[in-house]
Amino acid sequence: MGSDSTLSLPSSSPPCNNRSSVPPTFTTRIFSDVAGDIIVVVDGESFLLHKFPLVARSGKMRKMVRDLKDSSSMIELRDFPGGPSTFELTMKFCYGINFDITAFNVVSLRCAAGYLEMTEDYKEQNLIFRAENYLDQIVFRSFHESVLVLCSCETQEIAETYEIPDRCVEAIAMNACRKQLVSGLSEELKGRDCLEMWTEELSALGIDYYVQVVSAMARLSVRSESIVASLVHYAKTSLKGIIDRNCQEQRKIVEAMVNLLPNDEKGSYSLSIIPLGFLFGMLKVGTIIDIEISCRLELERRIGHQLETASLDDLLIPSVQNEDSMYDVDTVHRILTFFLERIEEEDDECGYDSDSTGQHSSLLKVGRIMDAYLVEIAPDPYLSLHKFTAIIETLPEHSRIVDDGIYRAIDMYLKAHPLLTEEERKKLCNFIDCKKLSQEASNHVAQNDRLPVQMVVRVLYTEQLRLKKALSGDSEEGSWVLPSGVQSRAVSPRDTYAALRRENRELKLEISRMRVRVSELEKEHNLMKHEMMEKSGNNGGTFLTSLSKGIGRIATFGGETRQKVNRKSRSVSERKSSRSGR
């Protein structure tokens, strides 16, 4: 076609009631002395034209003119591709008036030419030939032009008849693959090619065509980094300003994004090129708009396979179901399960002789994250005990070096749920390994009234054993453990003696604390006994007798320990005197 700009021509008024959008040049440029002899109506808009230019290039117009009755000079074209504006361009072509074929009108022109049967059978280099030539020579050789044409196909369903969308999709994928090969030779171009061109260009497509394009790219082995960058940008653009729970289009977009996520060569989900924040964002949006269960599980599985890189904010997924709890604990529990499955699979693949340092490091990181998560959700008064303990039970014991975090979470849960039974409190406290508590946490336990008495006694007993072990020097590999949990080694007899003196003082201080605690328990016991006697008379005698024996054992335990410590202190003093005598 010519290179002139598209003409904007005034309309004329033919001698009929219908308005004509065809300018006088249509009737005077070629046939200056012949008036228009046919009226074509397109979507209610009339065009006064000449039969000869139309029938010379259009098979459909030739048939319709031939079928006209002698008294009629009007033809009506229904559902014309592109409407009156596109019909005007086709008439300009028939009259030999130059205009530009562009990426914005080529689809309409190609569909209109097919509708009017403007083939080579009627005229050489007819409109179908010109439109197809533009597609082949200009559009399909350019990534940008192909995207523009594919966008215009969304409003032209008839374009599917001529396979324009399919050809655009293949052209986009081929151009992307070609540019990848070029950019692969230059590290400078590689990042810009992946993160700028595709992310910006493809975000203009509707979700149906976008899915086809990305699928074609994956089939042609376009870099996964480029595909992921495009997915992230497309999701941010198309899901902006959400969220409507009943929006089918948004649900369709999220589900399509999930299905397009790439896997590595082994089909694994642990591709680090997929940002974890993007996966969590899709999961949170998907939870709100209620995407399919299979898509939710896919997102949870992918998140679980790189859970060690997550943050606390990522895990705080609001609950949108008909529940009273603030957070979606069930989803986090499933994510944690997927993470542990990954660790187990890696252990099975590596075997017993392999170095499992990486897996253990990941497990420790997740342990810290989950402890922080438990602390965050524990104050929720509507959080059920079952869901709270499910998170704790799922993590193995070796996922924590210290249990201070889990103790803090349990303590906060007890504070927010004062109506728990004694058995439920005991069940919670059984998750705490007293040997893994720091000195600070152990001191807090000793003064914590929310904990069962058995828990307090267990912690105090563990602390005593730890101190006794430190004083006796009986520890593995010649080392001993301080109450703070820090391991040390004896450097010289003087250092050992000084350390023993410090430990002796700490032991005496701990015993003093124990006495205070036992005294408080005895006061509580007397108060309970008094109240029970008033309410139940002699019926509560058996229970009180049992409780008295229990507290008596606590006092006895403290007394025996005190005697042993005094004997140990005297032993230390004797060794000191012996050294001085030497």
From Swiss-Prot:
InterPro entries cross-referenced by the UniProt entry: BTB/POZ_dom, NPH3/RPT2-like, NPH3_dom, SKP1/BTB/POZ_sf
Residue stretches making up the BTB domain: 36-103
Domain of life: Eukaryota
Alphabetical UniProt keywords: Phosphoprotein, Ubl conjugation pathway
UniProt entry tagged with the keyword Metal-binding: no
Residues carrying Phosphotyrosine: 407
Residue ranges of domain NPH3 in the record: 196-466
GO terms, biological process: protein ubiquitination
Keyword Kinase: no
Pfam families xrefs: BTB, NPH3
Region annotation (Disordered) ranges: 1-21, 558-582
Metabolic or biological pathway, per its Swiss-Prot or TrEMBL entry: Protein modification; protein ubiquitination
Basic and acidic residues composition-biased segments: 571-582
Family (UniProt): Belongs to the NPH3 family.
PANTHER family given in the database record: OS12G0117600 PROTEIN
Domain comment in the entry: The BTB/POZ domain mediates the interaction with some component of ubiquitin ligase complexes.
Protein's job: May act as a substrate-specific adapter of an E3 ubiquitin-protein ligase complex (CUL3-RBX1-BTB) which mediates the ubiquitination and subsequent proteasomal degradation of target proteins.
Protein name as it appears in the record: Putative BTB/POZ domain-containing protein At3g08660
Species of origin: Arabidopsis thaliana
